[in-house]
């Protein structure tokens, strides 16, 4: 994980950044319950360790909605799609932002109860997900768990024919 110097600007001075490794300590051994919705009536509540990487949340969301993990993804912590202010992108698309989902933990992303943020999957089709932290639980979970599910997810490739 990055320290303040690695996150610094070209002069080696640390940037002011809400995404700080120091936030991780008070969330050790805890988990988030995050509501992830695609559209009205279709959502999943996912419990995931506060210590999990953002890429693990990405995988949990894709699995929860039955999508294939075959496209780029990003998280927008300021709740604005395509914002470059507080965003995390998958490795390989760093042109969009310097923070990658495989290097930052949820505990470093400034999450707390009530925090809303966006998740974008497939930059071409733009599958947009609204995320909201419902609670911070005192117990940790080893792997992400779907604790509530409502509605049927749309097909990822509705016009794709098996030939």
Predicted regions, residues:
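Short linear regulatory motifs enriched in tryptophan with gly/pro/ser
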Residues: 1-163
């Amino acid at each position: 994980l990055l320290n303040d110097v690695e996150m610094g600007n070209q002069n080696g001075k640390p940037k002011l950044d809400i995404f700080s490794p120091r936030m991780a300590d008070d969330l050790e051994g805890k988990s988030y319950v995050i509501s992830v919705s695609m559209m009205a009536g279709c959502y999943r509540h996912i419990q995931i360790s506060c210590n999990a990487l953002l890429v693990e949340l990405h995988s949990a969301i894709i699995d929860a909605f039955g999508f294939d993990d075959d496209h780029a993804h990003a998280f927008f912590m300021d709740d604005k799609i395509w914002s470059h202010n507080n965003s995390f992108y998958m490795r390989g698309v760093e042109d969009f932002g310097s923070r990658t989902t495989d290097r930052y933990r949820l505990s470093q992303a400034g999450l707390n109860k009530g925090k809303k943020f966006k998740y974008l999957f497939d930059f071409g089709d733009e599958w947009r997900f609204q995320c909201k932290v419902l609670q911070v639980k005192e117990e940790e979970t080893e792997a992400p768990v779907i604790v509530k599910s409502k509605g049927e997810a749309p097909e990822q490739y509705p016009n794709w024919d098996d030939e």
